[in-house]
Amino acid sequence: MQELGKAEHTSIRVTPQGENRVIVEKDLSSEEMILNMGPQHPSTHGVLRLECKTDGEVVIEAEPYLGYLHRCFEKHAEMVDYPGIVPFVDRMDYLASMNNDFAYCIAVEKLLDIEIPRRVEFMRVIVSEINRIASHLVAIGTYAIDLGAFTPFLFCFRDREHMLNLLEWTSGARMLYNYILIGGVAYDFPKDFARRTLEFVKYFRPKALELQKLLTENEIFVKRTKGVGMMPADVAINYGWSGPMLRGSGVEWDLRRVDGYSVYPELDFKVCVPDGKFSDIGDSLSRHVVRALEIEESLNIIEQCLDKMPEEEGFDPRSAIPKRIRPKAGEVYGRAENPRGELGFYIISDGKSTKPLRCKARSSCFVNLSAMKELSLGQLIPDLVAIIGSIDIVLGEVDR
C-alpha cells in the first residue's frame, strides 16, 4: 500500500437519547490508500488489474488497467484473408464463439452483398442461442461463486455440458467452433439434432427456473447485490453500454429487435428488462436478473427456429460461400447481439486485396468495463467483487 495523503472529514455521531442531539467531531484525519486488485485476483475474471484509491473501506476511485491479454487481433486481421479471420474472431470472447463468428460474418456479407440460404439463417440463430445460454450459465455460476455460493456454480456447469455436447456434435469442437462461415456454415445439422435439442429444451426449462429462484430469492445473494453498483439509464447510454448491462438499467435495447438481422424479425421473443420486483433498477442484481430471464427467451427462440426451419434433402450449407472473397472498395459496420452486448466489426476494403485494409472490433466488454469508475464510486471494497461479476467481462475480448 502507498500513502497518498491525508483528508479532513467531519463525522456526526447520534446519541442514544434522540436524533436531535448530536455530537460533532471535527478534524478527524484518515489516510487515502492505493490498493491493487489483480491481475491475479480470481474474482477479476482474467488478467484485469484494478488500482483502487480507498478511504478506509470506501472506494474513492477504481482505475482498470488493461492489456495483459493483448493478442494483436486487429493487426492479424490485416495479414490474412477474410475467411482466415474467423478463427481469430473465435478467440476473442471464447465463451461465445458462435456469436462472435455471427457478428463478423454479418459484416463481411454486408460488404459482399450476398444472400444467405434461409435454412442457414435458422441454423445460425439456433447455435448462437445455444451458445448464449451456455455463456449466461458461466456468468451466473461464476458470479455466485464470487459471492460465496458454490452450489449454483455446480448446477450451471452441469447443465452447460448438455449445450457444449450439442455444439460439439454439430461443429466438432467444444469451444472455438469455427462453424459459422462467410456465406454459410461448415456442416449441416446431424440427423437427430432437432429431436435432441428439443429434448434438452424440455429438460432445461424447469432447471432454469430453479436456478433463477436459487439466487434471486436467496437473502444473502440479494443483500450482496441489491443497490450495489447503481447505473442510471442516461449514464449507461452515455457510456455506450449495451446488452444485459444496458437492459439492466431499464433500457429496452436489443440488436436482435432493433436491427432485426437474420430471421429474428420472424421470431416472437421479449426484450428482458428488470421490473424492480427483485432489485433496484440499474444495480448489480438487475444485471443478473436480465441474464437469468434471457435464458428463458433463448429457449423460446430455439424452439421456434426448429419449428420454422425448412427441411431440405441433400442440403449443402456451403453452397453460398464464395470461392474467392475480394469485396469492392468500401467500408461497412456489422454488428450482432452477443451475450455481453453489441459486438461490431468495422471493415474497410481497398477493392484489390483478399485481405481487409482495416478490421476494427467494437468490444462490448471493453465499453462496459470503461464505466468502472462510475460504478465503484463510494462503494465498499468487498462490493467491488459484486460489481465486476455483474459486468461479466471476458478479457480475451476486452484486450483483443
Swiss-Prot record:
Domain of life the protein comes from: Bacteria
Q: Which reaction does it catalyse?
A: a quinone + NADH + 5 H(+)(in) = a quinol + NAD(+) + 4 H(+)(out)
Q: How does it sit in the membrane?
A: Peripheral membrane protein
Q: Which SUPFAM superfamilies match?
A: HydB/Nqo4-like (SSF56762)
Q: Which Gene3D superfamilies does the UniProt entry name for this protein?
A: Cytochrome-c3 Hydrogenase, chain B (1.10.645.10)
Keywords per UniProt: Cell inner membrane, Cell membrane, Membrane, NAD, Quinone, Translocase, Transport
Q: Name one GO molecular function term.
A: NADH:ubiquinone reductase (non-electrogenic) activity
The protein's location, in the record's own words, is: Cell inner membrane
**Looking at its record, which EC class is this enzyme?**
translocase
Cellular component GO terms, alphabetically? plasma membrane
> Subunit info?
NDH-1 is composed of 14 different subunits. Subunits NuoB, C, D, E, F, and G constitute the peripheral sector of the complex.
What does the protein in this record do? NDH-1 shuttles electrons from NADH, via FMN and iron-sulfur (Fe-S) centers, to quinones in the respiratory chain. The immediate electron acceptor for the enzyme in this species is believed to be a menaquinone. Couples the redox reaction to proton translocation (for every two electrons transferred, four hydrogen ions are translocated across the cytoplasmic membrane), and thus conserves the redox energy in a proton gradient.
Q: Which family does it belong to?
A: Belongs to the complex I 49 kDa subunit family.
What is the name listed in the Swiss-Prot or TrEMBL entry for this protein? NADH-quinone oxidoreductase subunit D
UniProt source species: Chlorobium phaeobacteroides (strain BS1)
